[in-house]
Each structure stands twice: as C-alpha cells, then as structure tokens.
Curated annotation (Swiss-Prot):
Keywords: Bacterial flagellum, Periplasm, Signal. It comes from Xanthomonas axonopodis pv. citri (strain 306). This is Flagellar P-ring protein. GO terms for molecular function: structural molecule activity. It holds the Pfam family FlgI. The gene is flgI. Assembles around the rod to form the L-ring and probably protects the motor/basal body from shearing forces during rotation.
Length: 372
C-alpha cells in the first residue's frame, strides 16, 4: 500500500473525534429515507461549442467535429461541398449532461454540464448551440443552449507547449436547458407510498413502522424488507401530498450503524467506528527497510597511455530492521485503547492498517474491514 506519512497523532485525533459516542437522537423520516419513485433522471446529449478564441478542436485529429458542423449547417440551409474540410480552431465537439429533477414540468430551466470530447484546449468564452438532451429511453426531455461558465484556464503554443489551470475543458451553463417533456406521474393509481431507507437496517425499519403507526394509527405502515416501508395512502393526489408532508416530519431514533473499519489504501486514512471491538489477541509488529543506491564511477586513464575512459556502476544495498513491538489486547478492547496503544510507540498510519488487517484475518476483529 502507498500510505501517507502524516504524523499518526494527527490521524488518531481525527479518528477519535469522528468516533465520539453521541446519544441517539431523533431523526426525521425525510432525512432517513426517500419516497419511492421520486428521483432525478440522467440526461445526455451531443453538441457543438462555437466562438472559442483559437482553443477549439484540431479538426485534423477530430474529423467528427467537421462532420457535425457540416450537418448543422446543412440543416440551416448552408451546403458545404463534401470535398471541403475546413480547418477550424474556434469550434469544439462536446458531450452534455444534466439531471432532470422529479416533477420537472415543460418550460422549467435546469443546469447543464458541458465537457470536451476531442482535443480542445479550453472552452472558455464559448457558446453551446442548441442540442437535444435524451433520457435512457431515447426520448428528448430538454433542449440545451447558452454561454459557458468555465472555472479553468488553458493555453497552447505553436510548438505544442501547453499550460492549464484547473480543468478548462469542462464548463457549466446555469439554467442552460429547458425541459420539453415531463416524466410520468409517480403518484397516480397506487394506494401505497413506499419509503426507501438510504442505508439498509432492519432496526430502523422496525422503528419507522412503529413511529408511523403511533402517529397515524395501527396498521398504517408495514415493513417490506430491510430497506422499504409501505404506507397506506389515499389515491387522491392532493390527499397523498398532505399525508406525505406530515409523514416526512415524523421523528424516530435510527438503529446503530454496524461496526466497520474503513481504510483508504491511497491516502492512508483510517476511520474506525465507535462500536468496533477486538477479541483477546497479542500482536508483534516490526518493519524491514531496504535501501538500494547506485553510484557511477569513472576510470580515467593517464595521458598518452592509449587507454579508454570506462564508466562502471557500483550498487550498495543496505537493510535495516526495527525491533518488533508487542501489543496485547484483552477481550472487548475499544477503539480508544487500540489507537492509544499504537500511538504511544510512535507508529505510523501504515502500522495501524497492518495491525487491523492481521486482526481481521485472525478472527479477532469483530467488525467489517473495508478497503477503498
């Protein structure tokens, strides 16, 4: 693993702050679950950005940009001969994506993101020409057009040198698309409202059913599985909205999260949940450091000796081993004790990661170990 070398005391402090046990507090249903069917839908499209200051596609390497421009001009009544390939630098082929929010109606604006798909240096100062945005079913749900807002900067010289700040090949158009088609009504025709938890938990589902029945009467809600709660509701849309406005504000105490240890293998970050416990175990942990250095030696013969200068390589390999450290954990050892034991000997974050992995393999870590 390529782990960070930040001081472990800082890491331990951050972990301890994240794991401070807080008393269970009541949460609203709207913060724990979402209404089934009420979600956004992804839209995607293809288009052209024009008006760039020489930072567009190099059409010799992106012929589809020229083809797209010819097709667009043809639709506008301008015919470009088939054997003519204009070398443009102020046009860029782009991919467009947006999210169609739930209950969006025709005429409402939505934001769009525009990304270069060829070799444009920057989209700064460009304008997106009218482009349709389609859903997964192939239907057009919105039309996008407008001036781009680009947070980055990029420039390229004639010799191929390039400088860029942030990502100039991606921009956004606030309110850059207009909804043209509404999604089907998810509230029509059913006598139940489904609530889907953000995290599956049988305890939370059981408590949610009890809280809803306590507020609206016995038998109002039923548990479907570890994620879903079904609630009886009227079929009239207005009455369903009124029920939901009361339902989403019902409060309950969610179940405790499962014991889990999360390790980021790239940064060395370790997050340990407050319910993590360790079975009785003893650990010896040491480290071996191998250093290889290369030195170049030059052998220079004397003047008029007729010899040749020779270059030789000399390798030096050294290995150092630190003394093993012994850790002994009694049954029920908590997060604070684990961190304190490893921290007292001045260990690095990588040492804690290795110890946790070894404990998991030995069956002494009563938690899920997740490496991301």
């Amino acid at each position: 693993m390529n782990l960070s070398s930040l001081p472990f005391r800082l890491l331990a402090a951050a972990v301890a702050l994240c794991a401070i046990a807080a008393p269970a507090s009541a949460e609203r249903i709207k913060d724990l679950a979402q209404v089934g069917g009420v979600r956004g839908n992804a839209l995607v499209g293809y288009g052209l950005v024009v008006g760039l200051d020489g930072s567009g596609d190099r059409t010799s390497q992106a012929p589809f940009t020229v083809q797209s421009l010819k097709n667009l001009l043809g639709e506008l009544g301008v015919n470009v001969p088939a054997n003519v390939n204009p070398q443009l630098k102020n046009v860029a082929a782009v991919a467009i994506h947006a999210e169609l929010p739930p209950f969006a109606k025709p005429g409402q604006p939505i934001d769009v993101t525009v990304s270069s798909i060829a070799n444009a240096v920057s989209l700064r100062g460009g304008s997106l020409l009218m482009a349709p945005l389609k859903g997964a079913d192939g239907q057009v749900y919105a039309m996008a057009q407008g001036n781009l807002v680009v947070g980055g900067f990029g420039a390229q010289g004639k010799d191929g040198s390039r400088v860029s700040v942030n990502v100039p090949s991606v921009g956004r158009i606030p309110n850059g698309a207009t909804v043209e088609r509404a999604l089907p009504d998810v509230f029509a025709g059913t006598g139940e409202i489904t609530l889907n938890l953000h995290q599956n938990d049988f305890t939370t589902v059981s408590r949610m059913v009890a809280a809803i029945d306590s507020s609206f009467g016995a038998g109002t809600a039923r548990a479907v599985d570890g994620v879903t709660v079904a609630v009886r509701s009227p079929t009239d849309p207005g009455a369903r909205i009124g029920l939901l406005s009361r339902l989403e504000n019902v409060e309950l105490s969610p179940g405790d999260a499962p014991a889990k240890v999360v390790v980021n293998a790239r940064t060395g970050t370790v997050v340990i949940g407050q319910l993590v416990r360790v079975m009785p175990a003893a650990i010896a942990h040491g480290s071996l450091t191998v250093t290889i250095s290369e030195n170049t030696n030059v052998s220079q013969p004397g003047a008029f000796s007729g010899g040749r200068t020779a270059v030789t390589q000399q390798s030096t390999i050294t290995a150092t081993s630190e003394g093993s450290r012994m850790f002994k954990f009694e049954g029920g050892t908590t997060l604070d004790q684990i961190v304190r034991a490893v921290n007292e000997v001045g260990a690095a974050p990588g040492d804690l990661v290795a110890i946790l992995e070894a404990l998991k393999q030995a069956g002494a870590l009563t938690a899920e170990l997740e490496v991301i």
